[in-house]
Amino acid sequence: MKKIKTILNNNKGWLITTASLIAVFTAIDITTLCVPFITNTLNTVFGDDRLVLKSGDPNRYQYYKTDDNIKSKSDALKYANEVNERIGEEGFVLLKNDNSLPLKKNAKVSVFGLNQNNMVYSGSGSSSKSNANGIDLFKSLDNAKISYNKTLKEYYNKLKSKYGRPASPTFGDIIDGFPTGEAPLSAFNSNNPSSMSGEYLDAALVVISRIGGEGYDLPRTMKNIDGADSNAHYLELDNNEKDLLKNLTSSSSPFDNVIVLINSGTSMELGFIEDGTYGNKLKGAIWIGDPGGNGLNALGKILTGEVTPSGHLTDTYVRDFFTIPSLKNFGNNARDKGNNYTVDGASTDYYFVDYQEGIYVGYKYYETRGYTEKLKGNASWYNENVVYPFGYGLSYADFSYSLKEITLDNETISSKLYESDLDKKINLKLEVTNISSTYFGKEVVQLYSSAPYIDGQIEKSHVNLLDFAKTKELAPGEKTIVSLTTTLRKMASYDYNDANKNNHKGYELDLGKYSLSIAKNAHDAWNNPIFEQDFSLANTLNIDIDEVTGNKVENKFDDVSSHIKTYLSRNDWEGTFPQTPTEENCEVSNDLIESFSVESYIGKGATLDKGKPWYVSKARRQQYVELTDEEAKIKLYDLIGKSYDDKKWDELLDQLTVKQMTQLIGTGNFNTGAISNISKPKTTDPDGPSGFTNFMTMIDQTATVYDTCFYACESLIGATFNKELAYKVGNAIGNEGLIGNERGDKRTYSGWYAPAVNIHRTPFSGRNWEYYSEDGVFNGIMASETVKAAKNKGIYTYIKHFALNDQETNRDSKGLVTWCNEQAMREIYFVPFEYTVKIGGTTAIMSSFNRIGSVWAGGNYNLLTGVLRKEWGFRGMVITDYNTHPEYMNPDQMVRAGGSLNLIQDMQPASSGATYNVTHRSALRNATHDILYTVANSCAMNGYGEGIKYVYAPSYWKMAIYSLNAVALVSMIIWGFFSIKKSFNSDEKWYNLQKISTCLLTVLKVVVYYY
C-alpha cells in the first residue's frame, strides 16, 4: 500500500489530468445525453437516432406506396420539380399586355433592376429554403433561347456588393423601413441605365422584388432608408425604382417595350402599371410571386409564348394601401409602444389587435363598397381605389362561354328554395371555348353568390366566392365543359349578435333575393358576370346543426366579439370605419390583465378545473411501471384503420404509464416520440410551406431531411386557381415523404408542417407568402386538395396556424391579444381549417401563438374542442406553434383544452404537482390517443406489423461522443501505464502487471461505475 501511495504521488500530473477529463466528459455526457431538451435539440441539428431492423420482414407491411414511377429520392425530386415548374406556368399572372408579349422568336432583351441577381424565391424564416442549385432568371431566359445583355448583367453584378438588398430581418424585428436593394441612377454612366442597352432592344425586363418572412411584418414607413421617402412604405416603388422606370420609358430611351416583373409573395401598390405614369412604353407586367427552386423556368416559356399565362390574383390589388380598413389595426401601427396595453399609464407585457373591420376584408370590402357607392351615384369610387380585383388575370388566348345547365341535385333548379334544399348540390355546367386563332390556353371561371342585405342587420359582403374551376389546355377552337358546385348552406351568414332580432344566433339565410354568378373575377361577379341566376327562399332559414357531425352549432366567443364596440358596417362606411388605437384605447383595467393568466383559465388549488367543461371525476388507470414489449399485448399496428372510437384504443392506452404519455406529449420537436413497447415509431415531421425542410439542421451529411423539392410560395400555388394542381402538390409531397431518409435509416417523413391557411388580412403581414390568398373559402378549397393527396400517401398535414394568426409583430409577446367578432371568425378565419377537416380529412392541426380574446389559441377549449372537435368532428392531434413561452403556452392548459402535442424539444405537461389530478390524467390520455391515432393512420407505420422488431442505434453525434470518451479513456490508460512504469526500479520487475493494474484499477472503477 505504501508503494502504491508513493507511485500515485509520483504521478500527480496523470492523476489530475485523468480526474479532470473524467469530470469534463461526465459533464458533457450528462448535459448532451441525459437532458432531454439538449439531447432532442442535438438530434434535430445533427441527426437523430437510427432505426435498425432486428427481426422480421417489413416488406410484408407496406400500407402506403409511392407512385409506380417513383423508386428513389431522385425520382421523387424530379417529379416534384416538374410539378413546381407547372405551378409557375399556371400561376404567373399576366397583369398587362399592350401587344408586348409574347416576344418574337430569338428576341434580345436587357434585364434591369439590381434584384435580378438576388431574386426572392421564398420568404425567410423556419420554412425557407435555399435556391443555390435552382433556376434563376437568366437560366430561364437561356432555356427559352432568349438572348440577354451580358454586359448589363455583369455591371449589375458589380453593383450588388454596394447597393444590394441586405439580409432579411430576424424574428421579432419591428422595422422602420427596409431597403428594396435597387441601385440609384448615379450608379450608371451619365445617370442613364438605358444607354447600356446595346443591341438588346426587343424588351427591357425590369425586376422589382419584395421579401417577407416569419417573425416580422413589412414596414409601413421607409424612415431613414436611402432611396426612399420617409412617408412611403415598403410595398410601393421606392425612388430608385421610379427613377429607373422613368429612364427606361423616357422619350430618349431606345426601348419601346418595357415589361415589369413583380417578384413578391404579397401584393404591392401597382397603380403605376395602369395609370399612365410611365407613358405608353410600359406595355407589359407579370406577377411571378416567389417561384421556389425551379418555378422561374416557366417565365422564359411565357415570354416566348410556348406557354400561355393562366394565373389569377389571389388578392385585391389596391391603389392606396392606407385605405385598407384592416390596416388601421395591424402590427405596431407606427406607434412607439405599438398596441401595448397599459394599466394606470404603465406599460404591460401584453399587446393587442382589434379586427374592427369585421367581415370586410379584401374583396369583401372593396366589392361591397364599390357596389354601394355605385348605388349612390359614385361609380368612380371603385376604379379610384382598386387596380386589379381578386381573381384577375390576362391570357394570350380569348374565350367564350355558354351555360349548359344549372341543377339542384340533378333536377332543374327552382326560383324558390326551401329548408329541405339546404344541403342539396347546386351544379352549374359551363362550356368554355378557346376562340383564339393562335394560342393554346387555359381559362379560369369563378362562382360567386350575393345575399340580400337589410340595413342595420346582419353584415354581408356583396359577393362571396363559392367555387372555381380551371379548364384543361384548349387548342384554338377547342371547347370543354367545366363544373362549379355549391350548396345553399354555403351562402349563409353568421349572425353572432342576433342583428336581425329574430331570437336566433348562428348561421342564417334571410328572406330576399339571392344570386349566383359566374365571372372572371370578383368585380365582374356583380359588375359584368358571364352568367347570373337569381332565386329566393320560401322562409328564413336558421341553421343550428353541423352538416357533417349533426352536432349543435352555437356561439362560442361572445366575450371576444363584445370587446370591440363598433365594427365596420356597410350601413355607414364612414361612421364605422376602423380607427387606429390611441393611448386611451390602450389603457385597460388590471382585471383584464389578470384574466390572461393560466390560473384564471384553468383555476388553481381548490378551484382547479371546477366548473370547467373539461372536468371529469373519473379516469381510467394507467400503468405504474412501464410494461415490457412482451407484457404490452396490444401494439399500435393493431389499430391501423380502426375508428377513433374503437374500444381497442382503451386497451392500448391502458398499457401506458403517465410518464410515457407526458414524454410523448412534451417532446414534439419536428417529430413524435417512440414508445417501443407498443411498437410506436419515432416519426419525422418537417416544416413547411416551401416543402420538407428543417431550419435547425447544420450538417447536410447527417441531416435526415435533405434533397427535397423547393416549392413555390403558397400565394403562387393559389394563383394557379387549379385544384388538380394543388392535388399534385400533395401527391408530390407524399412521394417525397414516403422515400424519406433514403441514405439513412429509410424512415419516412410522415408529418408535414403545412399547408398554412391563414389569410392575407393586410398586404404587410410578413408571412403572406406562406398563405394562399385573402379569402378563407379559396384557401380551404386549395389546401383540401393538397391534404387529400398527401393523406393518400400516408402523410399527415399539420394545417396551420389555428386561428386568427394574421400578423407577426408581437406574435409571441405573451400571446398577441386578438379581438374579433364571431361572424368574421366563422365566415373567414375558421373556414380554411373547417374545409381541410371536413373535405381534406386532415388528422393534424397546428395552433397559433396568439390569444383569441384573453385565452391562448393553443389552450382554448372553445376553439380546440368546442368548434374543432365537437362541431366539425376533427379526429387527430393538435400541436402548438414553437413553444419557448411556457408562461402562457402552458402544456397543462393545452391538454385540458384539447391540444395534444408540444412543439418543443422538451416541455412536458405535469405528471405530479399542483395541476395533476384525475382531470389532468384524463387529458393526458386524450392527447396521447390523438397522437397515436394520427400516427397509426400514416406511412410512419410502413414496415410495422406482427413479428417485426426494431431498435434505435445511436445517432452519429452520439457515436462521436462515445468515441471521444473511448479515445480519452484509452489514452489515459496508456499514459498511466507508462507513467507508472517509471516508478518501478529495475529490481522490482516493473512489468509486474498485478501491481500496475492495481494502480490503474482506481481509475477504471470510477469510469466503469460511471458508465
Segments predicted by a language model, with ranges:
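Glycoside hydrolase catalytic-domain context in secreted enzymes
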Residues: 1-503, 507-518, 522-523, 554-1011
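Short beta-strand elements
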Residues: 524-558
